[in-house]
Every structure is written in structure tokens, then in C-alpha cells.
């Protein structure tokens, strides 16, 4: 059983993650702009809800289990009548979401299904609240990331799917490569319409944070590493898929 309070406490102290959150969010916004996005459902908003960086929507609904994250999101969205925030696990809100008078154009499930015990249950819930035109965006860390392949080649891990100490600390249940993620999606009754990876991550979160702290690299280098994916396709730090109901 996932301990959400323990997760939230450790999330505050995870090195480099604020940078990764922004890189991840930039890719989500890139995907949003490709499709209809008037009504958006965000499953899990963390400390940085999508509405902070993207305002091109009519309605946004957020479902987030972490109390600290919900308090923060409600404070940031105060007096915004186009944003609804529910506290709880998404799987427990499926019936309520089906009853609200909003047809979702775009559903964001960001950096989540690798952390939960039963991704098929969550994907079934997503399928239930989606309609035939809804785009569902899912992203997860990539087992075939440059930094994991490097770790294998120097003997730090035995295989690219091996769980690291940081993964275990953050209650992450599994590692996906693109084929495993597509299979997970297909098994749930969804169909993948496009996919990709983003951000060439040369080192671990801890190592990258040290590089930034010691001014060995700066955010311009991070921007360059985002652009580097076109030279190393499939080796980005994270995978995304956009999918629909069959």
C-alpha cells in the first residue's frame, strides 16, 4: 500500500526533481498544443500544478491525494472558478468525475503509473472518465535513458530495469521502457497514437544537482540536454505516450 504522507515528505527533499518537473511540464504543454484542450483533467499535481504554466483551458479538474499538495494548489488557484480540486486517490473519484458536467478533452497522468501497485486499475478508471475523443497523456521514467545505460555499462546496475536506491526511497514500483509502456497501455483497452522521449539525462538526480550546486553546469546546459534527444532518439530520461479509447 502506497504511503502518501511518506512520499510527500521525501518529495520535498528529492534532488534535481524541481528541474525535472519543469522539463516534464514543458513537454506536457507541447503535447497539449497538438490537441483539443478546453477541458483538462490532471491526475496528481504535486507542488507545481499545470495551471501555473498553462492557462489555455476552459475548465481544469485536479485530483491529488497529498494534503500538502492540495493545500498548495487551492491557495494558488484561489478565486479561479474554472479550476476544481479534489483531494483523494483518482481511483476513488472515478464515479464522481463521470457525474460532473465536463467532457474531458485532455487527461494528464504525469509521472505516476510507475509508482502505483496496480496501474491497470488506474488506466481502467482513466478509460471510464474519457470519451472517444479524449487524448490521454501518460509519462514515466525511461529504463532506456542514457544515464541508466551508462550505469549498466560501468557496473553500477546489472540491468536497465533494476531499481535504484532513489526509486525504492520514492516507492516506485517498476521501470518501463517504451515497449513495456505501450503494452501496459494496450492491455488496458487504450490505443497509442504517438510517443517519444525527452531530455538526455547524463547522470543521476543526485549527480546533476551537485553539478548545478557547484556551478559545473547551469540551466542553459539543461536546455541543451532537452534538445539533444533528437541526436539520441529513444534515450531521453522519460517516455511519453498519447493515447485514446479504442
Regions found by a protein language model. Give the residues of each.
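A C-terminal cap/extension of S-adenosyl-L-methionine-dependent methyltransferases
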Residues: 4, 183, 194-246
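Conserved class I S-adenosyl-L-methionine
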Residues: 1-35, 37-46, 137-160
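A short glycine-rich, Lys/Arg-flanked "PGG" loop and its adjoining helix->strand segment in the class I
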Residues: 120-135
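A conserved beta-strand element that flanks and buttresses the S-adenosyl-L-methionine
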Residues: 108
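Class I SAM-dependent methyltransferase SAM/SAH-binding core
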Residues: 45-93
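Acceptor-substrate binding/catalytic loop of class I
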Residues: 18, 164-180
